[in-house]
Swiss-Prot record:
Alphabetic keyword roster: Cytoplasm, Glycosyltransferase, Purine salvage, Transferase
UniProt keyword annotation of Cytoplasm present: yes
UniProt protein name: Adenine phosphoribosyltransferase
Function of the molecule: Catalyzes a salvage reaction resulting in the formation of AMP, that is energically less costly than de novo synthesis.
Signal peptide: none
Protein EC: 2.4.2.7
BP GO terms, sorted: adenine salvage; AMP salvage; purine ribonucleoside salvage
First-level EC class: transferase
Single GO molecular function: adenine phosphoribosyltransferase activity
Catalyzed reactions per annotation: AMP + diphosphate = 5-phospho-alpha-D-ribose 1-diphosphate + adenine
Organism: Parasynechococcus marenigrum (strain WH8102)
Pathway(s) where this gene product acts: Purine metabolism; AMP biosynthesis via salvage pathway; AMP from adenine: step 1/1
Keyword Phosphoprotein: no
Amino acid sequence: MDLQTYIRSIPDFPKPGILFRDINPLLRNPAAMVEVMRRLGAICDAVQPDLIVGIESRGFIVGTPLALQRSLGFVPVRKPGKLPGAVIGVDYALEYGTDRLEIQSDALTGNPRVLVVDDLLATGGTAAATGSLVRAAGGELVGFAFVIELEPLGGRSALPDEVLAESLIRYP
């Protein structure tokens, strides 16, 4: 199945000059989602994680069913102030300014093997920050899995070389 046929390209969204890759048509198609889960499952099998970490918010959409499919736990990484209790956070650079991600401080006890899942790899800043956060929280980062990769933005170069990074759809 050619998953790219289920991705809609929307020019000038959210601002002029941006070509937005919309996964909503893919999410609406059960057969396409089954195929996404099959392919993400193969990546998961290759790295044998103990937990799936999903990045807010679309990482939740693909990470939770993957975790259920593989009988694994799911841990959300969220923006500041969204998680109850004690958290560990990491700040990371954006094009103009900084942002922050957080995880509950007890989410990765026991050094679990972690696969980070998200819908999109663009510049790699959010994914790299999540990888750092996983390590800071006590997890062993074993891989990244993305539905879409925008290759011209060079996000793969921001990720640790020693960790598997796979994308289901790549836009050159």
